[in-house]
Amino acid sequence: MHKKSLPLMALRDMVVFPGVIAPIFVGRPKSLQALSHTTISEEDNSKYILVTLQKKFDQENPSTHELYNTAILAKIIQIVKLPNNTAKILIEAVARVKLSNIKGEEAFEANYEIIPDEEIFDVNNMRSLVDNAVQLFSKYAINDKKVNAEIIETINKEISNSTNFIDIINILASHLITSLEAKQHLLEETSPFKRITTVISMLNSNIVNSETEQALQKRVRKQIEKTQRDYYLHEQMKAIQKELDEDKSELADIENKIKSLKLSKEAKEKAEAELKKLRTMNQMSAESGVTRNYLETLLSLPWGKYDNSKIDINQAEKILNRDHFGLEKVKERIIEYLAVLQRSSKIRGPILCLIGPPGVGKTSLVKSIAEGMGRKYTKLALGGVRDEAEIRGHRKTYLGSMPGKILGQLKKVKTSNPVMLLDEIDKMSSDFRGDPASALLEVLDPEQNSHFVDHYLEVEYDLSNVIFIATANSHDLPRALSDRMEKIYISGYVEETKLQIARNYLVPKQFKMHKIKKDEITISETAILDLIRYYTKESGVRALEREIGALTRKALKQILADKSVKHIAIDSNHLEEFLGAKKYNFGLAEKEDQIGSTTGLAYTEVGGELLTIEALAFPGKGEIKTTGKLGDVMKESAMAAYSCFRSRATNFGLKYDNYKDFDIHIHVPAGAIPKDGPSAGCALFTTIVSLMTKIPVHRTVAMTGEITLRGNVLPIGGLKEKLLAASRGGIKTVLIPEENVKDLKDIPPNIKESLEIISVSNIDQVLKHALVGTPINK
């Protein structure tokens, strides 16, 4: 070994001697880091590590000064990673070493120098001492029942195969039952004669202690009086008799349950067979406990139990409108779904999957569906699930096995026809334990789930009466799972909807939660709008509810602190006092017309945004540069806009070779925020034309639309959110693709009235409305 520095692992409960092969369980972070830092030696293609004893057993994170300097250089034979972030390694102790320059922050590391054993000059004397030690160990092993017979056989085999006195001494020392400090002292001793005499002394001491302990135990047993033995046996008989009576009563209860429950034929036969097996078992055996747990689980399921579900779509619609503002299309589809269920007790159509950003009401919609159907609601959280057994259950052969989560939820709600929410179905993953998404296929398929077999139960259970509804934040689902679902997309709330939700739902809810009396606190509409604009940035209303709660608490504190204050009216002026400085800003129109700066419109998870696009030209080679953390699609859109401009350069009074002398740098501010998508094409093109022709862009005009190389304007998404952002930011005119005119019917009237919305089909129309002057034929 040429390497003089290696990772170092501290041991708490063992001292390893050279020549010994030993298993080690690794669980502490520093030890795992040291293990991960090991590298393959160039000499023999093996990994090596240093191991040493720590001075204090109970020290979880010892310092470098709390480690012994005499250690072992070990070859790593095998590494087995365990599921609970630990590992088991098998090492072969190669040599005893002296440590120096021990360092340890994330993992210990040290320099080392091999310590040779002193030479044995009196071989005959050493042979005599070693033979004596081997005989003493055999005697000790026979006397002391604590030493396992297999260990004795292994040690004797190792000793008989070894011709090296040092190896035999190390083998005996490693199996001595003595303190860790004593073993460490043996390891540090370089004289073979001193080490073997110490081993012999320890063995003699162990033999004397063992014989003394055995004699003492024999004397104590003889001192037990006959009356005490009789009393003990009598009490034991009473306990056994009581246990037998209890077992008979318990088995009778199980038998009665089997007869009374509406089990399927298969389940009843299985239960009777398991009960028959249980009667013949020793009630104290482990197998008896496994069988008893199985029967208890099987009989606790709601076999044949159904809630009286009576669907009234008018009542269901009232419940949905009561609990949710807006979401008209979503509620309409849910009512259609319930209408089919009202006419047919079972639905064979696809499973509903509500997809949308956090906080838009997906979970509460499912609760309202359950209430509207008159069924119990249960939730199965699938986020982070990566084990197939959590869906299908564990087989009985495994220790601690149990049924899957599907049957676990039915057991919890005590009915076979609940509404079950499969929450965060897109957050499942897979690993070596299987793919839970594949396990869900049988659960969600109406043609198969009436014969669902849990691995633990091993009998069929009918899931066809369960209404499964899934939720997800992303539409990126496994193909097979996606095919079994009808996706209903729930977009983020627009500002007006958030205002109505806050005024009609969130404020009353927070007042009720904080026990606010009538007329004690009022929150103005402008204050709520400022909360939405400057203190939250989200698709849903969770953060808005938290901020309203914070406002309520601040106001309540003032009322309770000052008895003269009877009423607090919270308006926009109170927000910074109660909640601190503004957290966010929404985009505003430019203050004046700019050259090379255009206002685009973006659609994000949290709504619409104004997107400023600016450009500069400077001497160069005709290249285009983009900054602002733009995605690949947006970069390609910029290239398309530049190519379209170059092809029309003569239309703007520019020569074909003008652009060759300039580089154009396009930047989209808020550089830390990723931006992507093709809908900024119009704005990018307008920015380049304005820059090169020196014609300003109207500051009150915003635009959205993808462009082609031929200058056509293509449709975009998120029109509603983009128009809302334009109205909020002081924009007067918005240019939209002609193909998006059909989407204007979904835009609130107040938004359409506040904006001049112009449809365009090509970039010439865009430039006509966007630029202060016209560059055509200049």
From Swiss-Prot:
Lon proteolytic domain mapped to chain residues: 592-773
Location (main, coarse): cytoplasm
Entry's Gene Ontology cellular component terms: cytoplasm
Segments forming domain Lon N-terminal: 6-207
Highest taxon of source: Bacteria
An annotated Gene Ontology molecular function: ATP binding
InterPro entries assigned to the protein according to its UniProt record, in alphabetical order: AAA+_ATPase, ATPase_AAA_core, Lon_bac, Lon_bac/euk-typ, Lon_lid, Lon_proteolytic, Lon_Prtase, Lon_prtase_N
Biological process, per Gene Ontology: cellular response to heat; protein quality control for misfolded or incompletely synthesized proteins
Binding residue positions for ATP: 356-363
Pfam short name (any one): AAA
Enzyme Commission number: 3.4.21.53
Residues at the active site: 679, 722
Keywords in alphabetical order: ATP-binding, Cytoplasm, Hydrolase, Nucleotide-binding, Protease, Serine protease, Stress response
Subcellular location: Cytoplasm
PROSITE patterns: LON_N (PS51787), LON_PROTEOLYTIC (PS51786), LON_SER (PS01046)
Induction pattern: By heat shock.
UniProt catalytic activity: Hydrolysis of proteins in presence of ATP
Family note: Belongs to the peptidase S16 family.
Function text: ATP-dependent serine protease that mediates the selective degradation of mutant and abnormal proteins as well as certain short-lived regulatory proteins. Required for cellular homeostasis and for survival from DNA damage and developmental changes induced by stress. Degrades polypeptides processively to yield small peptide fragments that are 5 to 10 amino acids long. Binds to DNA in a double-stranded, site-specific manner.
Quaternary structure (record): Homohexamer. Organized in a ring with a central cavity.
PANTHER family: ATP DEPENDENT LON PROTEASE FAMILY MEMBER
Name of the protein described by the UniProt record: Lon protease
Species of the source: Rickettsia conorii (strain ATCC VR-613 / Malish 7)
Lineage: Bacteria, Pseudomonadati, Pseudomonadota, Alphaproteobacteria, Rickettsiales
The gene coding this protein: lon
